[in-house]
Amino acid sequence: MHAIEEIKQLTETINEHNHSYYVEDSPSVPDAEYDRLINRLKQLEGENPHLCLPTSPTQRVGGMALAKFDQITHLKPMLSLDNVFSEEEFEAFYKRISDKTSEAPTFCCEPKLDGLAVSILYRDGVYERAATRGDGTTGEDISENVRTILSIPLKLRGDNFPPLLEVRGEVIMPKKAFDALNDRARAKGEKLFVNPRNAAAGSLRQLDSKITASRALGFYAYALGVVEPETWALADTHYDQLMQLRAWGFPVSAEVKQCGDVSSVVAYYTDIMTRRDSLDYEIDGVVIKVDSIEHQGQLGFVAKAPRWATAFKFPAQEEVTLLEGVDFQVGRTGAVTPVARLKPVFVGGVTVSNATLHNADEIARLGVKVGDTVIVRRAGDVIPQIVAIVADKRPDDAREIEFPDTCPVCNSMVERVEGEAVARCTGGLFCEAQRKEAIKHFASRKALDIDGMGDKVVEQLIDKELVESPADLFKLTASAITMLDRMGMKSATNLVAAIEVAKTTTFSRFLYGLGIREVGEATAANLANYFKTLDKLKAADAESFIKVDDVGTIVAQHLTHFFAQPHNLEVVDKLIEAGVNWPEIEEVAEESLSLKGQTWVLTGTLTQLNRNDAKARLQALGAKVAGSVSKNTDCLVAGEAAGSKLTKAQDLGVKVIDEEALLQLLSDSE
């Protein structure tokens, strides 16, 4: 037998044995025979390295360590799920969706795995890449690490699969693997992982994939992502699509079940919760999805979650501990939040020493005092909070919790706006606590987008008193930046250059970067297009602000308060003096808004026009620029390497133009 033929045969045979062992939990050969096969394959590949196949099981051991993870933009956003915490909340969810479907919905239920969500892409049935969920739009490229997970197929089984297939699922660390990992760490005197989820996340995000390969991670598929061509015939229920994934070689939870009505869903939830501790992986609830793909389409999505699915979370775990004190933290928007200092207690898999008390109203509602014995809960198994006090254990020397009248950071007055529960520092950018978060926000990707200006850099700049306001960023020199940890002259020079580039921005990004409460990207764009100039916006009153699209009385109040603060105006003026600028937004008559009422989408790489500039100029002509193609899209601008959005636009009959046509349109409109 020729070497290539034997390599192919061994690769296929060993992958089948791996599937039997890691996916079906049914070993098909003795360990000695498996070892003989794998050693023979290694020998042949060593003698013929040019014949090694990308699907070879020997490629799962990990490769060269990376300097950092690259970013991957998901072909379709990876959305999160809304939660329900009781049978009553689930019944309300059911009523909401049943009113919107053509017939009573049925469900597909599965355990809510407590791991890390990932997207895996296959092209022509062969593993190509994998990414973390990230912010839902962009994730980290963890392709080499995911390749090491033995339960994930490198080549799909069978031959009836689409040319391009995206699979979504959860990477987990089984409880046995977690215990073994901590046993090894304990023997070496190393720090232990607190729970399997943290261990899975830490293992998957190792820059050295060899470390990931040693961690015995597992994977369960829970959904299809992008499938191309879109006309590819798929099952018409979520359950049957999961069974198709299983047939292609993916692990799918054995606990997946179809449920016909509310009572059967609740019974499933109760059963899984009862058996929770006996499962080999950590879960924190069950996921309930409308089973019919047609019904899913009828229900659609809200901003960041599908309407047709929800996570039915288990009751949060609670413990009793002592409230030893209360600290007050100040956030980017000036919110003063009381944080309870607790006698450390193990709750829901982690040691908790702090818990939120939210605000003064919550403190009053609980009637809590320093020195009280309190009940701590991890709400949704994530955020620790105090839910009650044990009144009969209150000591005689228990002390009232006094909310500060002045900011604990800058001593500015603390005020509480009528109708709001949150108290806020009025120091604005003068306040160091707000300053750190404000400068991080100002430099962020959606604001001035200063490349290399990460959170740790900002914190060091402020701690070393090199920067006090956003305007000070533009005074930084390379020699000053080298004072920061891990900043050599080359990195410092690059950062100074990036700051210089960021001086030229857009009015809307500048406004967004100021961090005015409740002024997001869309509102900032509306304000920029309405007022056109900074001077006009600064001179506006609440009545003028309310005339802007999507600006109500509360946002108008935040705007007037911000521009009424002398220190905020001083920062804005210093930014302009430092050279921050943007293209002038010309006055446009209503009849000149040639794209008013239209929805446009940008896709692919634009070579002559910055994407943000293109978006701003389209908005200046009255267009709404959306992130995805639908039947309501009026036009798609397709740059180089346009992908699934272009295909969808063509299928829907949406008008498509290239970058040259866009430039011509913008030129004709000026």
From Swiss-Prot:
This protein's record includes keyword Metal-binding: yes
Top enzyme class: ligase
Reactions catalysed according to its record: NAD(+) + (deoxyribonucleotide)n-3'-hydroxyl + 5'-phospho-(deoxyribonucleotide)m = (deoxyribonucleotide)n+m + AMP + beta-nicotinamide D-nucleotide
Any one cellular-component term (Gene Ontology): cytosol
Binding-site list for NAD(+): D31, A32, E33, Y34, D35, S80, L81, E110, R133, E170, K289, K313
GO molecular function, one term: DNA ligase (NAD+) activity
Cofactor: Mg(2+); Mn(2+)
InterPro entries: BRCT_dom, BRCT_dom_sf, DisA/LigA_HHH, DNA_ligase, DNA_ligase_CS, DNAligase_adenylation, DNAligase_N, NA-bd_OB-fold
Domain of life: Bacteria
One Pfam assignment: HHH_2
Keywords recorded for this protein, A-Z: DNA damage, DNA repair, DNA replication, Ligase, Magnesium, Manganese, Metal-binding, NAD, Zinc
Residues reported to bind Zn(2+): C407, C410, C425, C431
Keyword DNA repair: yes
EC number: 6.5.1.2
Protein's GO biological process: DNA repair; DNA replication
Residues the record marks as active site: K112 (n6-amp-lysine intermediate)
Domain named BRCT: residues: 590-670
Known function: DNA ligase that catalyzes the formation of phosphodiester linkages between 5'-phosphoryl and 3'-hydroxyl groups in double-stranded DNA using NAD as a coenzyme and as the energy source for the reaction. It is essential for DNA replication and repair of damaged DNA.
Family: Belongs to the NAD-dependent DNA ligase family. LigA subfamily.
Annotated protein name in UniProt: DNA ligase
Name of the gene this protein is made from: ligA
